Each structure stands twice: as C-alpha cells, then as structure tokens.
Regions:
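N-terminal alpha-helical transmembrane segments of multi-pass membrane transport
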Residues: 1-74
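Intrinsically disordered, low-complexity non-transmembrane regions of multi-pass membrane transporters
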Residues: 1-19, 25, 71, 75, ...
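Alpha-helical membrane segments and immediately flanking helix-loop junctions
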Residues: 88, 96-102, 117-127, 131, ...
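Entry/N-cap segments of selected transmembrane alpha helices
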Residues: 108-129, 280-307, 358-362
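Alpha-helical transmembrane segments
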Residues: 167-185, 295-303, 326-329
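Membrane-embedded hairpin module used as a gating/binding unit in multi-pass transport
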Residues: 175-251
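Transmembrane helical segments that form the transport core of multi-pass membrane transport proteins
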Residues: 223-310
Length: 383
C-alpha cells in the first residue's frame, strides 16, 4: 500500500502543475493568444504559429531548452539544438536564400530610384538605436534591438547572435515577427496621416521591361559590390542573392524549388519553434522586454514615416510622378508592406495599381536592412 501511495505521489509531483510559476501560466496565455491570431486571424501564420507553439512548450516543460552544460547526462533539450542553429547564424542565412529564390528584383532593376526609398525606411533602425541607448542598453544590445525597425526577423536574429546578445534574442525576435505580422494594422494610419488624398491617388507609369541578362547580372553585381564594401554582410546578402540567382538563371529549377519551398519551410519550422522557446517566463517577463517591444513599435513607425516622407520628396522632385505611398514599402517585410501600399492606394482610387512599384522599395529594404546589420557588425569589429 505504501508503495502505491509513494508511486502516486511521485507521479502527481512530476506533473507540470507543481513546477510552474505564475509567469509560466501568463506566457502560456500569451502563447494561446498568438496561436489564435495565427490560426483565426491569419497574422503571419507561417511564423507566428511555430513561434507560439515553441513559447507554449518551453513554459510547460522548460527542459525542452535545457543547455547541454546543465544536463546531468550531457544531453540538451530538443529545442536547444534547434536554437544553436539560430545562434550560429545558420537559420537566418538559409531564410535569406529562400527569400531570394522567391523574389523578383525586376521592379527594383526597372526603377533604381527605389533604392533611395528602401534606404530612407532604414531611418527607423537608427532611431531605435539611439532610443535604446537612451533607455540604458549598451551599444551592442541597442544595435541588436534596432534592427526590429526594419521589420526583418531573420536579420534581427542574425545580428543578436553575432553581437553576443543571445539573452535578448527571444524578445527581439518575437517583437520583430509580431510587427511584421501587424504591418497591415500599423502602417495605414501613418501613411494616411502623412499624405493627402490627392497624393494617394497619383498613378505611376508602367515600369520598363527588364531583360533576363539584367536579372542574372543583378545578384552577382550586388554580391560583389556590397561584400567588397561591407564583407560582414556576405552571409545575408550573399545567400539572398544566391537564392535569386538560382531563380533567374533558369538552369537549376530543382534548386530553386528546394530553396523556396521544402528547405524554406523546414527552416521556418526550426527557426520559429526555437525562437519561441527562448521566451520562458524568467527570460521574457522583465522590464527590458517591455522596452524592446516599445522601441520596436517606435522604430517601425519611424521607418514607415521616413519612407513616406522621402516618397513625398520624390513626388515633388518628379513633379507628381511618384506616389508617396510606395515609400512605406521600404521596410523589409516582403511582400506585406508592398501589399499595404497597394491597398491604401486602392482605397483612394480603386483603379490605382501600385503593387509592382511598391515591390521595388520593398526588396530594396531587404538589402538595406542586411547592410545596416553589416554596418553595426563592422563598427563593433564582429565578423
């Protein structure tokens, strides 16, 4: 009888109920809210769903992220091994290759001025950097946090790992991906506030056709130029352009399909669950997390506003040939930001088609965010 009682007592105390804190329960609720947003509202479900599930798992069973040095038998938790691939900057680079394989740089090649709009939208990154310094973060932490302003989750993870800010990786990644999914909610009010209805109705001319040779040369030239100037950007820009070269060369269709489909989705699963698993209650529920979330929102708003304002400047310079709305697409949330530009423009004039024009600044923003990350790495002497 004593044996049965002891066994039952051990079983009961092995349940998670006796090992969780109020913080764990709060994070479980947050994870369930994220799952609801991903499934019911379809807010970036490909990313938000695995992130939310990783968050759920680590707050029920913390040992799923057990560090190998803390393990009594020398074996780490399952998601710990996934997380190492984030820390080693492997996952973000593979994500960039997949993005490159899915991206058409034709609108950017057809209208090189789009680079300026993509660059203008990076203002949010540097606004967040100085804001983070003012809030008491050190230089490297501020740099890692600031990339949220580019609405680029993989680059945020990449830079946080390279700068040794792994303790902040969870809040940074969750904030970055959350704001990426909230692009359709955050951007329109800013865009409408900074533009007149007349400006939103501006119709832009047809983009010129882009030859196959131009599309093949573009990733090669960008890789050479950017990597020579900022070698630290090679892992991100190089993988982005390699994926695009797969696509545009037309001779490696199998590699294009693999990079843009099977490999991409495998990496998203591993990246999402491991990032979510960094959000344990003890790591996530603190003042720094609130600061990071606030800074991310401010940075994203600043980046959107800077893009729109520069778009207005280009509108004046071209005597009304540029719709300022495409400037907001300069953040690197591809293709969500470009779709928002199209949607807001269509609300003013249903016959206005801005999507392809907005894709230029949008893909330029991807390159711009990677360059900003490389700049921070160069400044801090990290390779």
């Amino acid at each position: 009888m004593d044996y049965i009682v002891t066994t039952l007592d051990n079983l009961i105390h092995q349940t998670a109920f006796f090992n969780l804190t109020w913080g764990n329960y709060l994070m479980i609720v947050v994870a369930c809210v994220f799952l609801y947003l991903a499934i019911a509202k379809e807010f970036e479900p490909l990313l938000l769903l695995p992130i939310a599930f990783g968050m759920l798992l680590v707050n029920i069973y913390p040992d799923i992220m057990l560090h190998i040095e803390d393990s009594p038998n020398g074996t780490g938790g399952l998601l710990y091994y996934f997380y190492l691939l984030d820390e080693w900057a492997i996952m973000p680079s593979l994500i960039f290759m997949g993005v490159g394989a899915m991206t058409d740089f034709g609108p950017l090649i057809a209208n090189p001025k789009s680079f300026l709009l993509g660059a203008a939208a990076q203002f949010g990154i540097f606004a967040a950097y100085f804001g983070a310094i003012a809030m008491g973060f050190n230089d490297k932490a501020a740099a890692a946090i600031s990339i949220i302003g580019g609405a680029d989750g993989p680059t945020s993870i990449f830079l946080a790992g390279k700068l040794g800010q792994t303790a902040l990786l969870g809040p940074i990644a969750v904030a970055a991906y959350s704001y990426m999914s909230l692009v359709p909610i955050i951007q329109p009010p800013i865009m409408k506030l900074l533009t007149t209805e007349k400006e939103r109705k501006i119709k832009m001319g047809q983009l010129r056709p882009v030859s196959k040779l131009e599309k093949i040369l573009f990733p090669i030239i960008v890789t050479i130029v950017v990597s020579l100037i900022l070698p630290t950007t090679a892992p991100l820009v190089g993988m982005l352009m390699l994926g695009n070269l797969f696509r545009e060369s037309g001779v490696v269709r199998q590699l294009t399909d693999t990079a843009s489909n099977a490999l991409m989705y495998i990496v998203v699963i591993l990246l999402g669950t491991s990032v979510g698993a960094t959000t344990s209650a003890e790591a996530f529920l603190n003042l720094d997390t609130l600061k990071i979330v606030a800074l991310g929102l401010i940075a994203f708003a600043f980046g959107t506003a800077a893009g729109v304002l520069f778009g207005k400047l280009m509108c004046v310079a071209t005597k009304g040939k540029v719709n300022p709305l495409i400037g907001s697409a300069g953040v690197s949330a591809v293709p969500m930001a470009a779709r928002v530009s199209q949607k807001v423009g269509a609300e003013a004039d249903p016959t206005n088609f801005l999507l392809m024009h907005a894709m230029g600044p949008n893909v330029a923003g991807v390159i711009g965010t990677a360059v900003a990350a490389g700049t921070f790495m160069a400044v801090f002497g990290v390779f």
